[in-house]
Amino acid sequence: MTSSARNGSPSPSPALPSTTTPAEQESRNTMTTANNPGDWDSSESRPQPLSNGKGVGNGMVANGHQRPSTSSTAASANNASAKDPLRPRRKKAKRACFACQRAHLTCGDERPCQRCIKRGLQDTCHDGVRKKAKYLHDAPNEALIPGIRGNLYSQAQAARNKINTNSQQRNGTNSNSDNNSTNTNSNNKPSHQDVSTNFFSTPSTNNYNTVYTQAKSRQSQHMPSRVMQDATMNPSAFQAQPPASPTFDLSSNPQNHTLSPSMAQNSGTTPSSSASQNPDPYGPTFFDPSHPALFNFDIASMNFGNRYGALEFGMLGHLATGAGDTPPSDSATRRGSIGRSSGTFTVQNFGEGSSNQSPFLFGGDPVLNDWNPAGQGQTNSRNIYNQNSVSGQMADHPHAFAIESAPMNFASPSSTESPQMTTVTQFDDPSVNFSSRTTLMPPTNTQHQQQPQPPRISTPSLKNMQVGVKRRYRSPSSIYESVKEPYSYTSGFHSLTAFIQRRFSPQKTLQIAKALASIRPSFIATTKTLNQDDLIFMEKCFQRTLWEYEDFIDACGTPTIVCRRTGEIAAVGKEFSILTGWKKEVLLGKEPNLNVNTGGSSSSGVSSRGSSTYNSRNSATMTVMDNQSLPTGRTQPVFLAELLDDDSVIEFYEDFAKLAFGDSRGSVMTTCKLLKYKTKEDGVGLFRNSNGEVSAAGGGGTAADDTDANDGAGAGAGDGTTSAVNGVSNGSGNNATNVNANGNVNVIPNDLSGASSMKLSPKQAWGKSRIAGEAGMNQLGFRDGKVECSYCWTVKRDVFDIPMLIVMNFLPCI
């Protein structure tokens, strides 16, 4: 009996004896094997000698004849296609297995991979370990597990899943499941069906979804009939990849809340079995904060290479979207918040008590109701940011949508359909709130109605609170269109020099000149190569940067000013005007500057030099000295040196010389004295403040508590002293007049001027310990016309590395 007969195959027909020598046949087998280098891993394609001692291959019988081999033909076809340059490229796996990683071979996404199956290593085929990045050295190895699509596969885990499935079949709990998913071959090697099932399903996914399914089935009887229909939130839309987060399966029938077919197939359980296995739907396992399912993180769609970075990014997004316990007043400003009602905020968002709590955190159908166009009736005004969450009603519920899990229809609508929050109707009248709440509540049984109602938490009424940000008066595009000429810094420096010579003594002028002379060569070196277009571009950069600082000044409650490198004021905050009395229009040069307070010994305008006086300048008509350097009609803003006393100005320019071309991110923090805005008409008298109370006002002198006699006209002697209100009046009946620091004329009725005796209230005293409100800020520096402050300033440079603007923040010393 030949070898063919022993193998059970028909004997080949007799043929002529072969004339091929053994040496030629061995050489031919060697060439055939060399053409198939990829088959060396398989024992079938490796040449094996037969018992006759001749070096013939597997495809040769004992008599030297060659029989056809199916495996050799398939291998030849594969090798032919592998050499084809037009063959489709193999898609690389996201993470190679350990064996392929060690061999530096291309692996696949399936586990076990085809190469390990061919080599018989399917039992030990698992994902390889990558080298940690530098920023992940401190992360534990357990946190670097790949996402859902890259779950680690192990044969032991697959065996445990099959044992659980077989036990459920024996108990009769899973009679409707597909038996083909549990079939294995005789060698205990997993089939492709087992690989796909074990790859996508994890024990945590099964546990979390079944737990939440039971929670929905327990409370489904208290659900409203209308529920939200959204394809992006339906688990059936994710059949290709079941999510690991708790699935909100919103079907049309609230009484039938079960898992979707895809989830039931992947989890391998039914709702009935999950209800018996998980008696506590809200146990500690469901609210494990370390599990991404609690926050609905879809880690696989975040395009992160590791789980550690995806969780960190997801938690930051969860905090940014405000999915936590956010007050109702802030909920409308959060991206992706659920249930922003276009009507009003109501206390009854999820119902009073556990009987009316919806199993879905966002109620019945807030999306369909809250974003309805105007004119349609709304029957549900529930909101995720509710008052009951404060009292602990929703403490056992998970937070709703976080990052990358909110449907696309939650995006902000157009401005015409944007809702506006008002809290006028229901918060003002509790009875209206209660009546509207009872009409919106679904009917419940008597047992739940007899439960005690928790106390209502009232929210202060916010009148006419509008949603949105204050619109700008201009856009950045207008800056590039309006700037046509460069700014004349040469004229600005000439005006600054003329002002310093008029105000300061020769010794102080020399100190300031030395400081400016130290940075003059640097200015010349950086500007000598600039042409007209560069100077225009420089001014556009300045205006664009100033446009950004306007929002900063409005949002910051600190007195702030922004000036050019010449010291000319370019922007000012409202708080600075309150503190110093300088109006914004005066500082920017839009109104005449009538200030006579230069920090001297009196308010007559005499400076520390003693001989020269400071001439107030008009923004439209320059003085004779300024006309020599400024073009006609150019507005002249106030210089920074006009706002500080002499010592503060000298100290500022000495620091500016060090910081202008020094540290680009450096800053200076020191103390100074700001000068109050005072005119010649700011005499001694009385004025009525915003609270209707009477207080004293004086020029640059000091306020005295002496008892002086006046004639009721309200005017002082002009010598820098202020007459107190408790003086004796003759009761002439004439109204007292006074021009305050802002130029407004205040008239005091004759009943006050004719009073025999009045004293200042404690709130109107000039003591620093009694400063409160805007009126208290105005009182600072009224004795000597100076406000002692601590201030911090820095220099911002442009693209040419030239000092562009100076930003200064002040805080009064009280």
UniProtKB/Swiss-Prot annotation:
CDD domains, sorted: GAL4 (cd00067)
One Gene Ontology term, aspect cellular component: nucleus
A molecular-function term among this protein's GO annotations: DNA-binding transcription factor activity, RNA polymerase II-specific
UniProt superkingdom: Eukaryota
Biased composition (Polar residues): 189-208, 248-279, 339-359, 375-384
Tagged with keyword Zinc: yes
Residue ranges with Low complexity bias: 69-83, 171-188, 442-451, 720-739
Coiled coil: none
Gene3D superfamilies assigned to the protein according to its UniProt record, in alphabetical order: Zn(2)-C6 fungal-type DNA-binding domain
DNA-binding region positions on the chain: 97-125
Annotated region described as Disordered, given as residue ranges: 1-90, 164-208, 236-287, 323-384, 442-461, 598-617, 695-739
UniProt keyword terms in alphabetical order: Activator, DNA-binding, Gluconeogenesis, Metal-binding, Nucleus, Transcription, Transcription regulation, Zinc
Main location: nucleus
GO biological process: cellular response to starvation; gluconeogenesis
Alphabetized PROSITE patterns for the sequence: ZN2_CY6_FUNGAL_2
Family: Belongs to the ERT1/acuK family.
Protein name: Transcription activator of gluconeogenesis PADG_03802
Lineage: Eukaryota, Fungi, Dikarya, Ascomycota, Pezizomycotina
